[in-house]
UniProtKB/Swiss-Prot annotation:
Domain of life of the organism encoding this protein: Bacteria
Family, similarity comment: Belongs to the UPF0225 family.
Organism classification: Bacteria, Pseudomonadati, Pseudomonadota, Gammaproteobacteria, Enterobacterales
Name recorded for this polypeptide: UPF0225 protein Spro_2712
Source species of the chain: Serratia proteamaculans (strain 568)
InterPro entries according to UniProt: NTF2-like_dom_sf, SEC_C_motif, UPF0225, YchJ-like_M
Entry-linked Pfam families: SEC-C (PF02810), YchJ_M-like (PF17775)
Xref: PANTHER family: ADENYLATE CYCLASE-ASSOCIATED CAP C-TERMINAL DOMAIN-CONTAINING PROTEIN, UPF0225 PROTEIN SCO1677
HAMAP family according to UniProt: UPF0225
């Protein structure tokens, strides 16, 4: 049976993020880069993650910490909330929710981020992100179905 892409596109991995993660293609948009980076986390491809961080981040210094994080995180799924161009040329934003199980606690959690990407020489790079705060009465991004104030917002 074909392996579906971890990014949640519904496509086979070989026809979706694998060519990016393996370095045979370059993501043309911030959204494609973000999806391929999620897939790289799932596949434990530290080299791709480091290569797609903006050079100013000096991600090679984090190699061991990234590899260690693979042992304690089981990524469950990705939801892209919004993709937008930035105000400056060569800047883009992707808001997403990534669900995972924390291997230390066994708890299901969610990472909600608005990631910022910058383009250098026709290549997109992850530079940083902010964590949007859901409203207290909004559904919790962890996927529990509860209101944020009764779940992760306590």
């Amino acid at each position: 049976m074909p392996e579906l892409c971890p990014c949640g596109s519904g496509l086979e991995y070989s026809a979706c993020c694998e060519p990016y993660v393996n370095g045979t293609q370059t993501p043309a948009t911030p959204g494609l880069l973000m999806r391929s980076r999620f897939s790289a986390y799932v596949k434990h491809n530290v080299d791709y993650l480091i290569a797609t961080w903006h050079p100013d981040c000096h991600a090679t210094e984090w190699r061991n910490a990234i590899v260690d994080s693979f042992k304690n995180t089981e990524w469950l799924g990705l939801t892209v909330v919004e993709e937008k161009q930035g105000h400056e040329a060569g800047e883009g934003f992707v808001e997403f929710i990534a669900q995972f199980v924390d291997g230390n606690t066994g708890e299901r959690q969610a990472m909600h981020e608005r990631s910022r990407f910058l383009q250098i020489d026709q290549r997109w790079y992850y530079i940083d992100g902010t964590k949007p705060q859901p409203g207290r009465n909004a559904i919790c991004p962890c996927g529990s179905g509860k209101k944020y104030k009764k779940c992760c917002g306590r």
